[in-house]
Amino acid sequence: MRKDLLILTDILKANVAPALGCTEPGAVAYAVSKAREILGEEPREVYVAVDRDILKNGMFVSIPGTKEKGLVFAAALALVCGKSEYKLEALREATEEDIKKAHKIVNRKAVKIVLEKDAEGLYIKASVVGDKHRATVIVKDAHDNIVYEERDGVVLKAKEENLKEDKSWLKAKIKEFTIEDFLDYCDSVDFKEIEFIGEGIEMNKKIAYAGLNEEVGVGIGKMLKRQIRDEESLAKALTAAASEARMSGYPLPVMSSAGSGNHGLVAILPIAIIGEERGYDREKIIRAITLSHLLTAYVKAYIGVLSPICGCGVAAGVGMSAGLTYLLGGSRKQIKGAVSNMLAGLSGMICDGAKIGCAYKLSISVTAALEASKFAMENIFIPSDNGILGNTAEESIKNLGRISVEGMKNADDVILDIMLKKQ
């Protein structure tokens, strides 16, 4: 394998990790947990400042193992029992007694969540106050990337001292590669280097079948279950059911992709289900999912970690379309064509926060990615003179990034304003 591609293994490991519940409340819980540990005494209250996308995505999503929603309860529960060693799964050991204590914290209004209007990109600042001390932690650029720690005005860690742990530079480095590079990597990398990718198959299938067979959410998974007739409809039903369970707070982790659990569901499940049902060997399936993860991360690097564009539907959908076409034996031209087909059809899906309705968006994404791949396998490619498409798949992705970063600057403000008025 080409030496310049070796870093893609590190990029994969930085992007693919387990997450319990929605990533945004998990990230807030992680920051609060770390601040509470630094505090070194009984916490009295916590102040959390977040960027608009963290606020938007954490507002109406359920907290695993509880019947509660939102960032306030996530922060309160982290004050009681959060463990920073588990990072985005900081709340995974919460008990019923812990939940009762968290309710008391919320009821005495000891948790304040505020919008940091000037924050650029992903930003969480958690300040935990006790009777004698105060501790502050800042998470930036990635959900699990702590860049600053302080206790009573004394800086314990700053970004400059934390470069080895800061993976945001590593995630951004993916922009230096092309789809050809990703394909060379997936074809030639030693299977042992990417075997860990397979852990996400079993992890995500477990919550998918829970969502399909148990009473969760509003019944999206159950309805799609009644429509299962082949491996493609099974893949769609399981992906949507997994998201519905996750957004409802079902207490099982998922394997994330590019910093999001829902991204991981789309990037992994459809390829795994279709591959297994059609009898493909496990190595081929994992190599295809590896391509899916790489394309998902590539799109996210351009549209932003948190974006007005639905990353679960569009970014992970692009990854899925490429990975599925790879699995089915498509040529490199067809794989790139599937990417452009997907962007031609679904690039306009917005992100209006994490919630149960995301399950429906994932269902739509899987359907679109299946069709984008089928079109490509039949050598049907949406022409490059259509809309935002570029002359190459990479150009199309970069154009989507321009729309997200330059063209939708006010979209999140409007979306968030609409959501806040419903509280």
Curated annotation (Swiss-Prot):
PANTHER family (UniProt xref): UPF0597 PROTEIN YHAM
Gene Ontology BP terms: L-cysteine catabolic process to pyruvate
Superkingdom of the organism of origin: Bacteria
Top-level taxonomy: Bacteria, Bacillati, Bacillota, Clostridia, Thermoanaerobacterales
Any Pfam family matching the protein: SDH_alpha
Molecular function as annotated in GO: L-cysteine desulfhydrase activity
InterPro entries: Ser_deHydtase-like_asu (IPR005130), UPF0597 (IPR021144)
Protein name, as recorded: UPF0597 protein TTE0269
Family listed: Belongs to the UPF0597 family.
Segments crossing the lipid bilayer: none
